[in-house]
A protein has these predicted regions:
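N-terminal Rossmann-like or analogous alpha/beta NTP/dinucleotide-binding catalytic cores
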Residues: 1-105, 175
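Active-site cores that bind ATP or allylic diphosphates and position pyrophosphate for catalysis
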Residues: 95-182
Length: 187
């Protein structure tokens, strides 16, 4: 899948990602889906999406025929609600009123995990992460191991304004769409 956010115009990084995505898909007999990651309602603009689609078409990158041409996160609220309901049923979700300033870094310390806050105005929702390792195979680097609970702590899945977070939306989308390979750049 190629999944840009329409928060600005297509740039060289997008083009490189598109070339690699289409190339890897073709080399492995896969298909390319276009997913517009427009979860950030404050920064996403229709004219950026239109320009992005025009630029991709001009470059010759179009979603594969027969697939849903464009998937938009803004059209998938019910999918996210269903995923949230599953997490709630497993008692993995809790309300959190911590601001970015209070957290102060990349790792959330779990302050609200046991506070018993009520969901509503002024709170976001976090998912309780399991302790331990997560493993995966990186096509370039080989087998990898990470500890998300130690690296970032419990992840925010819906913010105080009721918007789905990037981390939650892309994870649910990839699971829902049965994506097996994700291409990201490394810095």
């Amino acid at each position: 899948r190629f999944a840009p956010s329409p928060t600005g115009y297509l740039h060289l990084g997008h083009v490189v990602n598109a070339i690699v995505t289409w190339g890897v898909a073709r080399a492995h007999g896969g298909a390319v889906w276009l997913r517009i990651e427009d979860h950030d309602r404050q920064r996403c603009r229709p004219h950026f999406e239109a320009a992005l689609l025009d630029d991709l078409a001009w470059l010759g990158f179009v979603p594969d025929v027969g697939l849903t041409p464009i998937i938009r996160q803004s059209d998938r609220t019910q999918v996210y609600e269903t995923a949230l309901a599953s997490l709630r049923a497993a008692t993995r979700v809790y309300a959190c009123d911590c601001s970015r300033a209070r957290i102060g870094g990349e790792r959330y310390d779990g302050r609200c995990r046991t506070r018993g806050l009520t969901e509503g105005s002024g709170t976001g929702l976090r998912v309780r992460l399991d302790e331990g390792d997560e493993t995966f195979d990186d096509l370039r680097l080989g087998p990898q191991r990470q500890r998300p609970s130690e690296q970032c702590g419990d992840v925010l899945i819906r913010d105080r304004d009721g918007q789905w977070t990037y981390q939650f939306a892309v994870t649910v989308d990839d699971i829902e769409d049965r994506k097996s390979t994700r291409l990201n750049s490394s810095h």
